[in-house]
């Protein structure tokens, strides 16, 4: 595999740093997957997502023990939405490895030949077909009739969208032709043509509704409607290109499969070609790239597959992708235009997101008038790692900018043409208050780079309307308050009706206002459908009305059942940045209830470290360990007492030569360095702060996040209001009598009867520690299908390995 920037950067990481970066990348990828697959609202371009994925894979290549330890590492998509029934794929829907350069294609072909042990004279053919930018779909036919249609979901479990798929004209309800297998799962892509996409957006605009960002989002949103009538009103299309479970083999090459599909009435992309060398594959890639703008639908690359199915079976799979296939991505498309203004939108997590208003320009056949500017750091010419980007060039209103449309998704401003900058252009100043709620907007210290985060975030938290719905959805989620029945739709209804703006409002709900909000929402949807010429739902019958009343009473009952809740769940439900389930449990172990924790945080806030202390901690060659040893005592050490030195000079003298060099390079002179060291000595954090920050399960990053959250008066008031409605209980202590007390358990491979998070929670409840890697200290490895390197590690260390069924039997006895 060619050396990439990602693999080069990983080479310098220690094991601890790699684990931290792996976790950070996993969180970013899992969020991106959720937004892309479930919300149909991606925040990242394809290129940005691919860069995250490449770095994650580079870390796993160097540290194999991290492979499969997170959803991002093990999965290929996102967990299916709760809105649809779930369908488990008989054969997983995997993703593909990516190529970004011709050299990657050459290496792919060479790798296939090496694996198959082919001589130079032995041929191997590949199919090359356009990579459709739509929504992956699996169609299950039994006896030629469509019985189930499911989205990709997380690759293992998808969403049942059968009723909607049956409304798509390209998808036959019954296959035609002969020799159709008894069971046939057809895999393909649902998409919208450019013409149909423009028509949908025109209707959206006429109805005063939000426009879809691109055809992919529109196609995904249309297929994933709860009402099939809405799907039927949108002209979705479909291309078949692969298969899942089949009752019997029906041909022996990939190209023949596509011909059989065509004969059975399934649409197949006409630009698929059989190639016999890397040169032919790349030539077809270039030809499709040249035709791209005129195809009439979005594609973002070309997919190559080994044609011989026997070869495919021998090549098999590696991690989350087949060895016999590769996606060759297109480079971004560019145009130059003028930046007219910068607007600020507040994201679901409080991020202040700059949006470029552009003089309209055509990019890749699409007229673009808006583009993302990512974040404050990006506008200033600073990357997420704190290092300069674009050679430090900032972006200003009035600039001539280069706009890129990468992966046919979200356009972004890539660079600025300095030669055309107006003389009166001034640096853009980000607002320091949230435009949605007026709370302070801040840039936090990045725990990895020790530099200011590139993103400015609203501190309004629970009271910010821009974040409100998402915060409330998190609050009621399974790992939060776990309020049964309060799905996403109910939260949106209650928020829009003004009944629930913060968590405490949920516990003040009454039957009549709640019912009125639900009825009003239903009537509004009916009116909207009539205006669009769609069939409105029938009025609820008396029986339906009684069922609705019962459902509302059940909602209120679930609220009453949560008037007492464990402290760790309470904390996690608040959605405080950096406070995940593990940190929430650590806090709950140390404090009996929420008032005790808040009192301790008030003391910690008063004893926070000062700016000079933090600045010193971030210097190269210093770090927290050196800093703490340096300030262990301010009294003169032996050998210092005889010298008439200031405190700052004494402290500087305790540094190693390389550390002194770093300090002097930063502060400029010995006098400035000594003064800064003395200020840092007076700004050391107190014991109340270190109670949190020095705790290995909490740490300074989570501590600072807690302090910042509760220092915002709105958040403090919202939590106190919630505490008037509910009480917190101590975390149930794990006793030594617990079945797995003190044991370290590792899960590897695919668990088929419970999710990874369920397995982890069960083990922890029984006293075990769950680890992501196997060592001599591991007591038990639970292995499912697809287990890899961890099995070898277990054998090497003599660790007991059990199957998932064995594990469940052990649980039954616990």
Curated annotation (Swiss-Prot):
Taxonomic lineage from the root: Bacteria, Pseudomonadati, Pseudomonadota, Alphaproteobacteria, Hyphomicrobiales
Function field: DNA ligase that catalyzes the formation of phosphodiester linkages between 5'-phosphoryl and 3'-hydroxyl groups in double-stranded DNA using NAD as a coenzyme and as the energy source for the reaction. It is essential for DNA replication and repair of damaged DNA.
EC number annotated for this UniProt entry: 6.5.1.2
Gene source species: Methylorubrum populi (strain ATCC BAA-705 / NCIMB 13946 / BJ001)
One GO cellular component, as annotated: cytosol
Needed cofactors: Mg(2+); Mn(2+)
Family: Belongs to the NAD-dependent DNA ligase family. LigA subfamily.
GO BP annotations listed: DNA repair; DNA replication
PANTHER family reported for this sequence: CHROMOSOME TRANSMISSION FIDELITY FACTOR 18, DNA LIGASE
Name of the protein: DNA ligase
Residues holding NAD(+): 46-50, 95-96, 129, 152, 189, 305, 329
Keywords, sorted A to Z: DNA damage, DNA repair, DNA replication, Ligase, Magnesium, Manganese, Metal-binding, NAD, Zinc
């Amino acid at each position: 595999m060619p050396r990439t920037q990602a693999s080069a950067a990983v080479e310098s990481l220690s094991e601890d740093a790699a684990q931290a970066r792996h976790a950070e990348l996993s969180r970013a990828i899992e969020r991106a997957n959720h937004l892309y697959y479930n919300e149909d609202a991606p925040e990242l371009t394809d290129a940005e997502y691919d860069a995250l994925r490449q770095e994650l894979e580079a870390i796993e290549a160097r540290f194999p023990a991290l492979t499969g330890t997170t959803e991002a590492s093990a999965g290929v998509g996102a967990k299916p939405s709760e809105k649809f029934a779930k369908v488990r794929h008989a054969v997983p829907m995997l993703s593909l490895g990516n190529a970004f350069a011709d050299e990657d294609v050459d290496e792919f072909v060479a790798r296939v030949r090496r694996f198959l042990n082919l001589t130079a004279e032995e041929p191997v053919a590949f199919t090359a077909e356009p990579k459709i930018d739509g929504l992956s779909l699996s169609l299950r036919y039994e006896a030629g009739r469509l019985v189930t249609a499911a989205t990709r979901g997380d690759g293992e479990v998808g969403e049942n969208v059968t009723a909607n798929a049956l409304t798509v004209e390209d998808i036959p309800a019954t296959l035609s032709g002969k020799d159709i297998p008894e069971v046939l799962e057809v895999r393909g892509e649902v998409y919208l043509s450019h013409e149909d996409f423009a028509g949908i957006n025109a209707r959206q605009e006429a109805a005063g509704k939000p426009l879809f960002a691109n055809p992919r989002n529109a196609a995904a949103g249309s297929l994933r409607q709860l009402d099939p009538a809405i799907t039927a009103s949108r002209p979705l299309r479909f291309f078949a290109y692969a298969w899942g479970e089949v009752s019997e083999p029906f041909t022996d090459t990939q190209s023949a499969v596509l011909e059989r599909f065509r004969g059975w009435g399934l649409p197949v992309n006409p630009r698929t070609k059989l190639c016999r060398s890397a040169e032919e594959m790349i030539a077809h890639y270039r030809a499709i790239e040249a035709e791209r703008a005129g195809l009439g639908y979005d594609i973002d690359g070309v997919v190559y597959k080994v044609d011989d199915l026997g070869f495919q079976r021998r090549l098999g799979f590696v991690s989350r992708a087949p060895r016999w296939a590769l996606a060759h991505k297109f480079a971004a498309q560019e145009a130059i235009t003028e930046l007219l203004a910068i607007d600020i939108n507040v994201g679901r997590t409080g991020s202040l997101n700059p949006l470029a208003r552009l003089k309209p320009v055509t990019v890749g056949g699409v007229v673009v008038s808006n583009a993302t500017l990512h974040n404050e750091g990006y506008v200033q010419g600073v990357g997420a790692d704190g290092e300069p980007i674009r050679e430090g060039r900032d972006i200003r209103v009035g600039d001539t900018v280069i706009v890129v449309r990468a992966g046919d998704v979200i356009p972004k401003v890539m660079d600025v043409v300095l030669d055309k900058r107006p003389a009166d252009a001034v640096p853009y100043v980000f607002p320091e208050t949230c435009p949605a709620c007026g709370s302070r907007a801040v840039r936090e210290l990045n725990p990895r780079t020790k530099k200011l985060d590139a993103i400015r975030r609203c501190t309004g938290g629970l009271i910010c309307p821009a974040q409100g719905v998402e915060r409330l959805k998190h609050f009621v989620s399974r790992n939060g308050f776990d309020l049964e029945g309060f799905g996403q739709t109910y939260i949106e209804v209650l928020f829009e009706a003004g009944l629930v703006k913060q968590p405490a409002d949920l516990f003040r709900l009454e039957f009549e206002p709640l019912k009125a909000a639900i009825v009003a929402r239903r009537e509004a949807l009916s009116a909207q459908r009539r205006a669009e010429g769609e069939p409105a739902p029938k009025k609820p019958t008396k029986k339906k009305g009684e069922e609705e009343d019962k459902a509302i009473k059940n909602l209120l009952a679930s609220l009453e059942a949560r008037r007492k809740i464990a402290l760790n769940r309470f904390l996690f439900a608040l959605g405080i940045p950096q406070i995940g389930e593990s940190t929430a449990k650590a806090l709950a172990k140390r404090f009996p209830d929420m008032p005790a924790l808040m009192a301790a945080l008030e003391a910690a806030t008063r004893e926070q470290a000062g700016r000079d202390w933090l600045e010193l901690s971030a210097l190269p060659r210093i770090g927290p360990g050196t800093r703490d040893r340096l300030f262990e005592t301010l009294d003169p050490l032996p050998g210092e007492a005889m010298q008439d030195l200031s405190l700052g000079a004494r402290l500087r003298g305790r540094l190693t030569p390389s550390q002194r060099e770093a300090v002097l390079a930063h502060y400029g002179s010995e006098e400035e360095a000594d003064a800064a060291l003395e200020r840092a000595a007076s700004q050391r954090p107190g014991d109340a702060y270190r109670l949190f920050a020095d705790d290995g399960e909490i740490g300074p990053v989570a501590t600072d996040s807690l302090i910042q959250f509760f220092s915002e008066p709105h958040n403090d008031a919202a939590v106190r209001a919630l505490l008037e409605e509910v009480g917190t209980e101590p975390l149930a202590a794990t006793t030594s009598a617990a079945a797995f007390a003190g044991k370290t358990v590792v899960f590897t491979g695919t668990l088929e009867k419970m999710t990874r998070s369920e397995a982890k929670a069960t083990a922890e409840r029984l006293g075990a520690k769950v680890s992501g890697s196997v060592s001599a200290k591991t007591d038990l490895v639970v292995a499912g299908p697809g287990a890899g390197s961890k099995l070898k590690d277990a054998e090497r260390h003599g660790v007991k390995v059990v199957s998932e069924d064995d594990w469940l039997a052990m649980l039954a006895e616990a």
